[in-house]
Amino acid sequence: MSETSPKLRAELDGVPAYVPGKPAAAGGPVAYKLSSNENPYPPLPGVLESALAAAGSFNRYPDMACTGLMNELADRFGVPLGHLATGTGSVGVAQQLLQATSGPGDEVIYAWRSFEAYPIITQVSGATSVKVPLTDGEVHDLDAMAEAITDRTRLIFVCNPNNPTGTVVRRAELERFLDRVPSDVLVVLDEAYKEFIRDAEVPDGIEIYRDRPNVAVLRTFSKAYGLAGLRVGFAVAHEPVAAALRKTAVPFGVSQLAQDAAVASLRAEDELLGRVGSLVAERTRVSAELTRQGWTVPESHANFVWLRLGERTLDFAGACERAGVVVRPFQGEGVRVSIGEGEGNDLFLKAAEAFRAEL
């Protein structure tokens, strides 16, 4: 037998592994998982019923065109059907965008730290990441990002709100930035946490896209809508980009169960708003208490908060786990803490206060 192995793409060498939020230990002392920005509420009304109905046809392929969901989204956001594309969560659509735009020799710009998947999917595409550090206030440095554009730049991610810091880019600064971006460079507004924003100065990306052919918007059903386990997201973009997304989509990638659940979730708007409102109130409470304890907490516009801890990051995460909550550490940088059930949030706050008392 030959000792050589199949030849693989060199671009995959050194691709960083995506690190998911650590789960709560089964049967152990840890009771609350605040590590993955999941919605703590059960599925919205009508979702389980739609899922059960879809379960009866698991022997059939799903609607590859996602017709029902696409029509619902077109009506909801007032966009043409040809400007929509679906995928396996917003990260799946982001990967499709890179497949459509970027390859070896191309550059992809994004802030750092930002969404952990960006460097992974960029390297898999063969393109080169250009990471632009956040400002001291943990927000996108849009001036520096604009200055980083070269003739090799093909795509720019703007995560708004930013994961994991929760900070936002407001309308005036975003418009100034977009005016500096060449028309042949695609700007992707990643709005996975859009529903949690309460600042009127933070623009709706779909309104921005309407007049800018080089802007695409990503949304997901994983966060506010509570469908993280079903993997369904979508993009809104002008026809050439949306058409390319449909070409790069995995055939039958979005299950029928996910499609039907997403439609049912869209139709449960009142309940959704109530749940999101409760999570925003908890976010405000948690942020205020952390500030009272003496922590520096960037203003969050998502369903999580960020603490920059540097070398103390893993110690803090360990203290939280011993107290009964799992948070998401980014070694040497800080921790992201999802807003969950009130009891879990209280346990986290107690752990944070105890840790600070020992500093």
Curated annotation (Swiss-Prot):
Keywords linked to the UniProt accession: Aminotransferase, Pyridoxal phosphate, Transferase
Modified sites of kind N6-(pyridoxal phosphate)lysine: 223
Cofactor(s) needed by this chain: pyridoxal 5'-phosphate
Pfam families in alphabetical order: Aminotran_1_2
Xref: CDD domains: AAT_like
PROSITE patterns (alphabetical): AA_TRANSFER_CLASS_2 (PS00599)
PANTHER family: HISTIDINOL-PHOSPHATE AMINOTRANSFERASE, HISTIDINOL-PHOSPHATE AMINOTRANSFERASE 2
Assembly behavior: Homodimer.
Family, as annotated: Belongs to the class-II pyridoxal-phosphate-dependent aminotransferase family.
Function of the protein: Aminotransferase that catalyzes the conversion of aromatic amino acids and 2-oxoglutarate into corresponding aromatic oxo acids and L-glutamate.
HAMAP family xref list: HisC_aminotrans_2 (MF_01023), Phe_aminotrans_2 (MF_01513)
Protein name: Aromatic amino acid aminotransferase
